[in-house]
């Protein structure tokens, strides 16, 4: 059986080691052990020829910078170029199943141009993310003002929401309409799939975690620590909730006696959110630490006391899954697919934009050992089964066989 992955991530292509390819690389390394004939096609910044390595066939998809610039306002043209490249790969490789990773990319459009069955592996879903992109009280003008009227930053941040995401949402709706098979892992993505593709076949499949997380020791309550360490991992889009971090930290600073340090990974600064909220990071013990690797993150999680996930919309954030796997107590906003991850007491859910309850439960976890250990135990119990890589690969392989047996798109 020949399987073609269409991915925005090059997985293990030209990676220095087998642990550098993120969770898709983790899955690649394990699934080839099953003897699967696997090819991966992915966007790449240089015009590399197809090659074999790591037990797979690699097909880099190259679109030149000048063409991207020339067609910056003609997004359909870029999509057409990628689809043609994918058609060429299909003609060359002749797969039995095409496995597309992520509906936010154009690759899922290929279902309209081939008789080979396509299964979409849902990651985030653009349509509901677009609806929740701006936090309450935030607008184009408030973003511009919070950026100190820096129009270049405003263009990069707000224009992406105002122009690019609506196009992505329309394209994604078309992809869902023309795709029959879907992998998902939360109640939320299953419900959204049924709305956008009513006749779809939906298969549950969890995500593999990075080796550094899987190999990590498990978290233990730090009874003797004087300073509480709070950890969050985020990125630059405003819907990721950096403003909630600042609001929650302010409440902890002004209304509790706990001494804390809140380390935020994935970003080097959140100045726009500082101006929007009127809260300075240093004034409320928040420190942006930039990007770190998986080994460093595992160590930080192990030595933290609470993980806080502030996003206004998400499906199944790997950052939450990684904290849970290690056993670090999680507080998260109950949005999108997050409630599925934190079900049955495997963490604490708070309403969206509710810094008060977030602060309350952070304080409770930091000061109530029994409560913290109860959360940790449940997280470890659920995560062990959810992220078992053998179970995940069995699920994927079974679906591949079912799709081939069905013999339909």
What are these regions (language model features)?
Residues 273-295:
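Nucleotide-activated donor-binding/catalytic signature segment of Leloir-type glycosyltransferases, i.e.
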Residues 233, 261-275, 290:
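Glycosyltransferase donor-sugar binding loop
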Residues 1-48, 56:
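N-terminal subdomain of nucleotide-sugar transferases
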Residues 312:
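Aromatic "clamp/platform" in nucleotide-sugar-dependent glycosyltransferases that forms part
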Residues 344, 348-355, 364-369:
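Conserved acidic donor-binding segment of nucleotide-sugar-dependent glycosyltransferases
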Residues 26, 142-182, 191, 195:
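Membrane-proximal helix-turn-helix segments that form the acceptor-binding/catalytic region
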Residues 4, 221-240, 246-249:
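Conserved donor-binding/catalytic core segment of Leloir-type glycosyltransferases
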Residues 329-332, 349:
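Short hydrophobic beta-strand element within catalytic cores of glycosyltransferases
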């Amino acid at each position: 059986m020949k399987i073609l992955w269409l991915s925005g991530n090059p997985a293990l292509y030209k990676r220095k080691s087998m642990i550098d390819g993120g969770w898709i690389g983790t899955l690649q390394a394990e699934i080839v052990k099953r003897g699967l004939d696997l090819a991966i096609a992915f966007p790449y910044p240089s015009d590399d020829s197809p090659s074999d390595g790591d037990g797979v066939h690699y097909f880099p998809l190259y679109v030149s910078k000048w063409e991207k610039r020339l067609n910056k306002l003609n997004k359909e043209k870029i999509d057409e170029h990628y689809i043609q490249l994918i058609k060429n790969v299909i003609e060359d490789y002749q797969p039995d199943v095409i496995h597309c990773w992520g509906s936010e990319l154009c690759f899922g459009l290929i279902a309209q141009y081939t008789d080979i069955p396509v299964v979409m592996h849902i990651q985030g879903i653009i349509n509901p993310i677009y609806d929740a992109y701006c936090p309450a009280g935030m607008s184009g003008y408030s973003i511009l003002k919070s950026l100190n009227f820096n129009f270049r930053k405003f263009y990069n941040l707000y224009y992406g929401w105002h122009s690019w995401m609506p196009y992505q949402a329309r394209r994604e709706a078309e992809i869902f309409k023309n795709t029959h098979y879907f992998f998902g892992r939360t109640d939320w993505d299953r419900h959204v799939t049924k709305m956008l593709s009513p006749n779809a076949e939906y298969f549950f499949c969890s995500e593999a975690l990075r080796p550094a997380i899987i190999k990590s020791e498990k978290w233990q309550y730090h009874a003797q620590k004087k300073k509480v360490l709070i950890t969050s991992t985020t990125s630059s889009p405003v819907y990721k909730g950096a403003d909630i971090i600042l609001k929650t930290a302010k409440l902890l600073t002004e209304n509790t006696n706990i001494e804390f340090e809140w380390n935020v990974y994935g970003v080097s600064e959140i100045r726009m959110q500082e101006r929007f909220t009127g809260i300075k990071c240093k004034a409320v013990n928040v420190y942006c630490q930039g990007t770190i690797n998986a080994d460093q993150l595992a160590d930080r999680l192990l030595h933290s006391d609470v993980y806080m996930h502030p996003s206004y919309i998400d499906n199944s954030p790997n950052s939450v899954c990684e904290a849970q796997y290690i056993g670090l107590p999680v507080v998260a906003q109950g949005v999108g697919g997050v409630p599925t991850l934190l079900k049955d007491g495997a963490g604490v859910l708070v309403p969206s934009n509710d810094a008060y309850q977030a602060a309350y439960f952070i304080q409770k976890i930091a000061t109530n050992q029994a409560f913290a250990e109860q959360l940790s135990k449940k997280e470890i119990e659920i995560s062990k089964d959810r992220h078992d890589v053998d179970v995940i690969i069995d699920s994927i392989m079974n679906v591949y066989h079912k799709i081939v047996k069905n013999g339909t798109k």
